[in-house]
From Swiss-Prot:
Pathway(s) of this molecule: Amino-acid biosynthesis; L-isoleucine biosynthesis; L-isoleucine from 2-oxobutanoate: step 3/4; Amino-acid biosynthesis; L-valine biosynthesis; L-valine from pyruvate: step 3/4
Residue positions of the active site: S468
PANTHER family named in the record: D-XYLONATE DEHYDRATASE, D-XYLONATE DEHYDRATASE YAGF-RELATED
GO molecular function: 2 iron, 2 sulfur cluster binding; dihydroxy-acid dehydratase activity; magnesium ion binding
Species the sequence originates in: Lachnoclostridium phytofermentans (strain ATCC 700394 / DSM 18823 / ISDg) (Clostridium phytofermentans)
Membership in a protein family: Belongs to the IlvD/Edd family.
Name listed for the protein in its UniProt record: Dihydroxy-acid dehydratase
């Protein structure tokens, strides 16, 4: 066993003395050491129940003959970090989580790992670590929040952000906003729509790294405690059979995940995280392939914010496996791949029927014949831009309008809320990319302000930043190259005509080559906004959004 390096032999007597200090017995040290990565904390609603999940995992590991040992991972609540400097520190934690988990796993010679994440950057960060360390690993998340109820209708956090915009437009009173505030987030768990956290937990299941129900069983259900116990037991099987993350997360597994992504209508953040996870697994996953998969993969779900169904509804309908079963009817998945169950995808999804065709459309009757996400290209986004097509109003799928240009999120929000943005405009928010932000902030506040003020079907927003999974509308993010490195988005001027054509995957602005070159000559890079601490190091190492904003050591010239 890998842990023999710290538990066996006379040379390891000092190591054993330290295990003795932990209260571990010789009998426990004779068993495999299973690291349980706990993301529990008291600041993230999606993580406040993870202590209970961890205890259940420990019981499962012990029942199956292992010795569970818990160590922590950090996690940020994107909702609490939203709209201020805190959002610069969200995406960057993905890589901190991957790095620190790698360090803990390698330093202590664990035989296997059980990852217990839940929210936005925590899930991909731990998937990246799993691929890097490549010892037997399984995931069990904390589960989604139940939807709130306001006046008898299901609501979620995206409704809350839009209520603030509606108040600014004079469409809601402060008392009505307060009612939303008190009711939209009724339980612990990851926010209740198909936002980033739930997207990544569902895609963990699709990749084969989580058991059935990992992405959809609500946080407050006792079924999730049982799932955690099963995950603890299952890791011992994976260890015995030496099934490792890179055996599971193959190139075909990532193509499966993209297909499920398109069917579910996941957050556009998946287009950042899947390439980054694939990179750690030794797989080159170019975002361009998303359009190829989208062209043949129907969109089957319109969960919030795209529609009025929620994660609890998806769970009742049969969950991720039911969606995969629908896709398999048209041969859209590779089903012979091994998963963390020790079985193939085909074996896993057999008999997992769609129990609610209103939540999961049958593949013969999809919301659209194409997937939920589109990658756009053109002179505005030479490398790529990403949009959640399933959350765009039909009248905005093709749009032409004047650019309203802002060099930071705050200036754009002020303009939107003060009524300076009108129907037909295209809001451009730049210098918010991975380097320029730094940290590629989510533009949920401006998109929610646009929707709340009744402009969601007439105003588009384009940014080199990114969007919360709770954003809806013609919200095009991840524009690459970003403004900070001289991408064309830096050269747009107020009033330039922008042409958006989502069905044809194009994003352009009307400018001659000569004029574009003139503007480029006059452009110069800006000084970094932050020059100390982790964000300064991140700025120096982070790559473009179209590459998943992975980190690379700068080459010495």
């Amino acid at each position: 066993m890998k842990s023999d390096a710290v538990t066996k032999g006379i040379q390891q007597a000092p190591h054993r003395s330290l295990f003795n200090a932990l209260g571990l017995t010789k009998e426990e040290l004779d068993k495999p050491l299973i690291g349980i990565v706990s993301s529990y904390n008291e600041i993230v609603p999606g993580h406040m129940n993870l202590d209970k999940i961890v205890e259940a995992v420990k019981l499962g590991v012990a029942m199956a003959g292992g010795t569970p040992i818990v160590f922590p991972a950090i996690a940020v609540c994107d909702g609490i970090a939203m709209g201020h400097i805190g959002m610069k520190y969200s995406l960057v934690t993905r890589d901190l989580i991957a790095d620190s988990t790698e360090a803990m796993a390698m330093a202590h010679s664990f035989d296997a790992l059980v990852m217990v994440p839940n929210c936005d950057k925590n899930v991909p960060g731990l998937l990246m670590a799993a691929a890097r360390v490549n010892i037997p690993t399984i995931f069990v998340s904390g589960g989604p929040m139940l939807a709130g109820r306001v006046h008898g209708e299901k609501r979620s956090l995206s409704s809350m952000f839009e209520a603030v915009g509606a108040h600014a437009a004079g469409k809601m009173t402060e008392e009505e906003v307060e009612e939303f505030e008190n009711k939209v987030c009724p339980t612990c768990g990851s926010c209740s729509g198909m936002y980033t956290a739930n997207s990544m937990n569902c895609l963990t299941e699709a990749l084969g790294m989580g058991l059935k129900g990992n992405g959809t069983i609500p946080a407050v259900y006792s079924e999730r405690i049982r799932l955690a116990k099963h995950a603890g037991m299952k890791i011992m099987e994976l260890l015995q059979n030496n099934i490792r993350p890179r055996d599971i997360m193959s190139e075909k597994a990532f193509l499966n995940a993209l297909a499920v992504d398109m069917a579910l209508g996941c957050s556009t953040n998946s287009m950042l995280h899947l390439p980054a996870i694939a990179h750690e697994a030794g797989v080159d996953l170019n975002v361009d392939i998303a359009n190829e998969i989208s062209a043949k993969t129907p969109n089957l779900c319109h969960l919030a914010p795209a529609g009025h169904t929620y994660m609890e509804d998806l769970n009742e309908a049969g969950g991720v496996y039911a969606v995969m079963n629908e896709l398999d009817k048209k041969g859209l998945l590779y089903t012979d791949l091994i998963t963390c169950t020790g079985k193939t995808i085909k074996e896993n999804i057999e008999g997992c029927v769609n129990r609610d065709p209103d939540t999961i459309r049958p593949i013969e009757n999809p919301y659209s014949q194409t997937g939920g996400i589109a990658v756009l290209k053109g002179n505005l986004a030479p490398d790529s831009g990403v949009v959640k097509r399933s959350a765009v109003a039909p009248e905005m799928m093709v749009h032409v309008g004047p650019a309203r240009v802002f060099d930071c999120e705050e200036d754009a929000i002020d303009a939107i809320k003060s009524g300076k943005i009108v129907a037909g405009d295209v809001v451009v928010i730049r210098y918010e990319g991975p380097k320029g932000g730094p940290g590629m902030r989510e533009m949920l506040n401006p998109t929610s302000a646009i929707a709340g003020m009744g402009l969601g079907s007439s105003v588009a927003l384009i940014t080199d930043g990114r969007f919360s999974g709770a954003s809806r509308g013609a919200s095009i993010g991840h524009v690459s190259p970003e403004a900070a490195v001289g991408g064309n988005i830096a050269l747009i001027e107020e009033g330039d005509i922008i042409k958006i054509d989502i069905p044809n995957n194009s994003l352009n602005f009307v400018v001659s080559d000569e004029e574009l070159e003139r503007r480029r000559v006059n452009w110069s890079p800006r000084e970094p906004k932050i020059t100390t601490g982790y964000l300064a190091r991140y700025t120096a190492m982070v790559t473009s959004g179209n590459r998943g904003a992975i980190l690379e050591v700068p080459r010495v010239k």
